[in-house]
Regions:
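Immediate post-signal peptide segment of exported/extracytoplasmic ligand-binding proteins
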Residues: 1-7, 96-106, 280-281, 306
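Short, well-ordered beta-strand segments
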Residues: 7-9, 108, 138, 182
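Short helix-initiation/N-cap motifs at beta->coil->alpha
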Residues: 34-44, 97, 135-149, 153, ...
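Pocket-lining segment of extracytoplasmic ligand-binding domains
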Residues: 148-258
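Secondary-structure end/capping motifs
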Residues: 226, 231-306
Length: 324
């Protein structure tokens, strides 16, 4: 019997590269892999269901599950993870020295419902007592104008939000002093250029992130992998095959990092970084599956509810195909 042909949309990570270059092949499946940035991929999957299998924003997936309108089934592949303490930028003249100083300030972000921003706001509320409604939000493109979110936010009335006009950008407003702070998933160019007017809220973000993980066990998950529900219903075995292949690809990527013969990545202290990661997160630091990721999954389910994107808190046990 011939293999099932499926499209897979994902970004070109070290942990997907073995799938892309053919070193790893899912059993019984021929993948037509479409490599694209998440900001292009996610709208195409959410609006058009364009791919049979796709990387997807975890926040969007949890929101749709909570609303009872999700056309996807997720596999417990936590494809993208990142701590977000480094992603909050402030004007040095805005009087913001602590997270609590963000109350009443004008803060920009590209999307309030994006997973990264949801995690940042969840951290603000649970770690520092700063709720979503304590801030005046401005939503728009970071360095170029952008359209409104794909998924309607349905924010509570108490949350104050303004959308940027067609000729405004978040970076431009921050540089001009029209914003006091920025929650940015990408490093702003004005910060990269060394503007003295822009600084990170947490200059010691690496130490903060390690402490946050030790206390909460949360390694924030940004993206998962989903299948269209019709594909899963017709071929439920596909979920297991996809999961196994992604695990094998990740193992090849991670195992290749610990090699002092010839460094796999262009980082001079790669081995030191890896050994420090083991000390903090353990050897299985990029674990897939429900059990090792439960703290982060419980957090995102709670945050999307608290921030008004979902009418209920979604349990981790609801998120993925069973028995995996």
């Amino acid at each position: 019997m011939s293999n099932l042909k499926l499209t897979l949309a994902c970004w070109d990570y070290d942990r997907t590269r073995p799938l892309i270059d053919g070193r790893v092949k899912p059993e019984g499946i021929d993948l037509d892999i479409r490599i694209m940035r998440p900001r292009e991929m996610f709208p195409r999957m959410l609006e058009k269901k364009e791919f049979e299998v796709s990387e997807l924003s975890l926040g969007s997936y949890v929101t749709l599950k909570g609303r009872g309108s999700c056309p996807f089934v997720a596999v417990p592949i936590t494809l993208s993870k990142i701590f977000r303490h480094s992603c909050i930028y402030v004007r040095t003249d805005a009087g913001i020295k602590t997270p609590q100083d963000l109350r009443g300030k004008r803060v920009g972000t590209t999307q309030l419902g994006s997973t990264g921003t949801v995690f940042m706001n969840g951290m603000m509320q649970h770690e520092y007592g700063v709720a979503l409604e304590d801030i005046h939000w401005f939503i728009g493109g970071l360095d170029s104008p952008t359209s409104r979110p794909v998924i309607a936010l349905n924010l509570p009335e108490k949350v104050k939000v303004d959308f940027l006009s067609s000729n405004q950008t978040l970076e431009g407003m921050l540089e001009a002093g029209q914003l006091d702070a920025l929650f940015a998933l990408y490093i702003p160019s004005i910060f990269q250029k060394g503007s003295p007017r822009i600084a990170r809220l947490f200059p010691n973000y690496s130490e903060r992130e390690r402490d946050y993980y030790r206390r909460t066990r949360i390694f924030p998950i940004m993206h998962t992998v989903v299948m269209r529900e019709d594909v899963y219903r017709q071929n439920p075995w596909v979920a297991g095959s996809i999961y196994k292949a992604f695990c094998e690809a990740r193992d090849l990527a991670v195992d290749g990092l610990y090699d002092t013969d010839a460094l796999r990545l262009s980082l001079p202290w790669l081995i030191s970084h890896l050994e420090e990661t083991w000390r903090v997160l353990g050897k299985d630091f990029w674990a897939y599956g429900l059990k090792p990721n439960r703290p982060a999954l419980e957090a995102i389910g709670q945050y999307v509810y608290e921030q008004g994107f979902s009418p209920r808190a979604v349990s981790p046990d609801e998120l993925f195909v069973p028995d995996m």
